[in-house]
Structure formats: structure tokens, C-alpha cells
Amino acid sequence: MLRRRQLLTTPAAAGEQALEKPARDAAGLQSASLRASVTAMGIVERKATAAAQATDFDRFRLRRFVENLPAEEIEIRREPIALADIADVLEGNAKAVWFHAAGPERQELVGSVTGSRSRIARGFGVAPNALTAEIRRRLQSKPEVTEVSSAEAPIHEVVLTGEDADLTKLPVHLQHGEDGAPFISAAMDFTIDPARGWTNVGFRRMMLRGRQETGVDLNSPSDLRAIYEASAAADKPLPISFVVGAHPVDQMAAVMRLPVDELPLLAALRAAPLPVVKCVTNDIRVPADAEWVLEGYLDPRGFAESEGPYGEFLGYYGSVKRNPVFHLTAITRRRDALFQTSTIGGRSLGLTDTAVLNGVRTEVMIWRALETAVREPLAVYATTSSGGMFNLRVSLRQRVPGDARNAIAACFGASPNVKNVFVVDPDIDVFSDAQMDWALATRFQPDRDLVLMSGMRSLPLDPSLNGGRIGAKAGFDLTWPFGTGNRLEARVPAPPVYNGKRFPSLAAALAEGPKYFADLMSAVGSRDGREIVLALDELRAAGRLERDGDGRYFIKRDE
């Protein structure tokens, strides 16, 4: 609970004074002029105006999404819980978990919100098997980004500056036993690319270093790394803001890798206008309906400080790295803000936020490439147990010889992170481990159907590379050789279906052409097949019955 203390200045003056100091500390980052009422301890509380009624700030709010999850998708823990116990509750849990009283401050915290395909699909309002198609559809929309005032933005209902902006007071927990420190793991980063004027959005982890400092991992190639390196080369701090507590649709947008301004991308995936507001200590615009925002800058010293180790999204530890340092200048939040943590790494990799988000993102990227490489892709699945990117399954209908191999090559070209590609015929469900295993066992000959490619750019986090960046990739053609998939031996046995054409007699049915036994039962409405057996026996005895190579019955033609 916040203690109020007497202010020696007018509320407006105090508000401006509280915001000027962190702006100067941030090496000249621009501060905003704010109309606010100020409580003690550097906290600014904004009052919404009537204009806020024009925008629905709850439609894409994380809290509302979590509140509407059914019981099979969320576990609610109302009792107080120590931060040290959070990770154990989340590990291997198929549900999202909502902690109502986490840590000494008894704050609300939710974890593993995007740790299942069904929950992400629920955020998009579609069934899980329609998720990637819906994302592809929304990417074609014309988005709208609407800027709102600070007074209207729920994210500015509470503003903490100066000493009161304290990262150690947030419900941030140690996630893995050998992690270097507690990590903020669900942070969406927002920066401005000066070269293009675009807002860049991504996902970062933030290792706590103190009350107002974290490490930020930029070792992997990314737009943010390129933007930061240019800023550091000019000896300038890079303004950056992190959103913590975002709707699954926004999180999906953050992991997409498209060469576009990514604020309109967020709006496109929402299929609704995106309300944004300018931050209080920099000029970055962030979603006005977020739960928390951490404002600040990356200092220009470059990859100067140790960061890590950390349990990475592939299920192993990443080593200590040299990374930039983030300096906090303000914390803004809703009055009833819900903090968020993402599950990353561990033995239950397929249930983690990062693996599921990565998987859906990979599927969308790969589909776009497949549409160019082959005429008819049917389904794509990036297995979450491989981190959502290493093992990829593709179902397609082959139109010409070589389609399967073209698909394999397209997958490798579309994403350097894809390591193994499995291509199957339409009768195989790519989401079924059992069916994929069966296809590998019965339709694959290694000397004929294995495609190996070496010297390929790969993900450095792959432990099998032993620290390298170049590796090999494998394609598994699990399709029937072109033109042979319709033969009897390639068909999958299934219970008979009796919906064939009806005939006045068995002889009339056989006169039309070869028929399977089930077709003959349908032809005369037989419910047990006994009369069919007897009738066929009579024809056989009369020397009139023949069978073709697939076992279908037909009447022998007169010589």
C-alpha cells in the first residue's frame, strides 16, 4: 500500500519535476509534458477523460483474456505464494496459471498464457486447426493505428519515476536452477528504427541487475540488434520500452519477422484499430491497453556486461554472454495491472510459451514459401517439442513429380532455424505423432527418400553444433512415389462405409463394373453380407464370376 506524504510544490509542478530527472539521467532522452495529479513517492495517477469512451481498452487486455479462459485452460491460485515457488508450479503444467498473491507484495501474476495452441487460437477466436490460416488472412488486412492521449491511456493510470521505479518490487522469479538471476521473461520490446522511422517490436528476456538495471540478450541476429549496434557505434543511448502483460494476439505479432513497421502489424493481427500512446520518458509509442510498461534506454557501451546463464527455449542452458544493459527511467501500469511471466525451456518443452509461439510463427512463414514452391500445401506443423522450429511437418497433394523435394528445399530456404523437414501425403495428419511415426516406418527408404544438405546457416543455440553457426539439414520424403498412391497397397484400411449406389439386383450391380464386397452390400441394401456370399458362390459355380487385381468382383464377359 502506498503512503502519501505532503508535497512542497503544486501537483502539476511536482509531476513535471518527477519526470525531468529520469529524462536527464537517460542521456537526454525526451520527456513528455503530463497533465496529472501526483501522489507521494513519485507516482503519477492519470484520470481518464470522456474521449476514452471512443476506444474499447479492454477488448485486447490480457486480464480480460485470462478472466474468460475456461477451467480446462487455467489454474487459479488465490493463496499467497513465494516467488521462489512459482517456477515449480509452472513447470510441465498444461494450463495457464493465475497467481493472485505472488511475492512479498502479493501482486497478481499469470504464467504460460500462450503455452498451448488452443489458448492462442482462442485469442484469435478460431479453432486450433484454423489458427495459421486466420493469421495469414489477417496479415492481408489494412490496419489502423490510433494515437490517444496520456490522460486516456489505461497504461498511464499509474506512473512511477525516480527511486520509486524499482524493478525489484515486481513479481519477477528465478525460473531455472542455474539461471544467473531472476528474469523478466514476457517482455515485448518497442524501439524506433531511425533509418526507416518504423517501430520495431520483438520479445526479450531481461536479467535483473538492480533496482533500475537489467541485462538484455541481443546475441542472436535481429532487427533490434542491428538498431542497437548502429546506435552504440554513434555513442548514443537507444531509447526502448518493454510491455509486460499483453494479449496473445499482440504476443503473436511480436514474434513475427516481417520487414514492416510493426505497430500496424499488431493492428493487423488484432483485426481492429490499435490504440497507442507515447511513453512518458521517451518518444516510443506503445499499446495504450497494455498492463505494464518499463521505459528506459540501452546504454551505448555495447556488449559490455555478462548476462546469463539462462534455460533457453530449446531445453538446454545458454552460457554466460556479453550483452547490453537496460536502464529504467519509468514504470507505467494500469491500476489493477496483471504482471506476466513466460515459460521457457525445461523438460516439458512442448508446453512452454516460447515453443508454441515459435511454432505458430514458423508455420505462417513456411506456408508463404510453400505456396510459391508447390501448388497445393495442405497443412504445416512445427513441433513444439523441438522448440517450434527445428522439426517441421508438411502435408501436400503432389501435382507433379518432385513436389515433395521442392517443398523440403522451400522450407530450408524460408527459415534457417528449420533443421528437419518431414513431407507426407494428404492422408497423414501432421499433428498426430502416431501417424507421422507410421509414415516414417512404412513409406520411407533412407537410400531413396532422405535429402541431406550440408554447410547451411543454422541456429547457434543448437547444442549439437558445438558453438558453430553452420550445420546440416535433413529432409524426409514420406510420400508415396508419384503416381503410386492410389494402388490398393497404398491405401489405409478403415471400417466399411455403406453409402454406394443402389441397384435392383446383385447382377445389375456387377453388370455396371467391378465392385468391392462392401459396394455390393450397399448395392442391394444388405446388412450382414450373407446373401452376397451365397449369390457370389452361385455365380462362381456357374463360371460367370471373375475378380480383378484389387479383389473387386465382376461378371465374366461372354467369349
Model-found features: residue ranges?
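N-terminal secretory signal peptides and thylakoid transit peptides that target proteins
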Residues: 1-11
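A short, conserved structural fragment
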Residues: 540-550
